[in-house]
Amino acid sequence: MAVFDDVRDVVVEQLSVDPEAVKMESKIIEDLGADSLDVVELVMALEEKFEVEIPDTEAEKLISIADVVNYIEKLGK
């Protein structure tokens, strides 16, 4: 769950949400209250944290925390 922990840390910092609110099934917009600008900033922070590039076409598919974790794990980070 190391990737989840790192993703949670980034989400908590970027969205100013309680760490307990960030679960694998949490939806970034619906559950965590992010708007479109928050999502862009979150993707940029994730790219920096994991040293990856997330194309816009892929970022649009990242709806939940699980989507983010699975995508980053798929990249081998």
Curated annotation (Swiss-Prot):
Tell me where it mainly resides. cytoplasm
Keywords, A to Z, come to: Cytoplasm, Fatty acid biosynthesis, Fatty acid metabolism, Lipid biosynthesis, Lipid metabolism, Phosphopantetheine, Phosphoprotein
Q: How is it modified after translation?
A: 4'-phosphopantetheine is transferred from CoA to a specific serine of apo-ACP by AcpS. This modification is essential for activity because fatty acids are bound in thioester linkage to the sulfhydryl of the prosthetic group.
What PROSITE patterns does UniProt report for this protein, alphabetically?
A: CARRIER, PHOSPHOPANTETHEINE
For this record, an example GO cellular component is: membrane
Where in or outside the cell it occurs: the entry states: Cytoplasm
Q: Which InterPro entries match?
A: ACP (IPR003231), ACP-like_sf (IPR036736), PP-bd_ACP (IPR009081), Ppantetheine_attach_site (IPR006162)
Which stretches make up the Carrier domain? 1-76
Q: Which GO terms describe its biological process?
A: lipid A biosynthetic process
Gene3D superfamilies to which the protein is assigned, alphabetical: ACP-like (1.10.1200.10)
Metabolic or biological pathway: Lipid metabolism; fatty acid biosynthesis
Which residues does this entry mark as bearing O-(pantetheine 4'-phosphoryl)serine? Answer: S36
Q: Which GO terms describe its molecular function?
A: acyl binding; acyl carrier activity
| SUPFAM superfamilies, sorted | ACP-like
Q: Which PANTHER family match?
A: ACYL CARRIER PROTEIN (PTHR20863), CARRIER DOMAIN-CONTAINING PROTEIN (PTHR20863:SF76)
What is its biological role?
Carrier of the growing fatty acid chain in fatty acid biosynthesis.
Similarity remark = Belongs to the acyl carrier protein (ACP) family.
| Protein name per the record | Acyl carrier protein
In the record, what lineage is assigned to the organism producing the protein?
Answer: Bacteria, Pseudomonadati, Campylobacterota, Epsilonproteobacteria, Campylobacterales
| Annotated gene | acpP
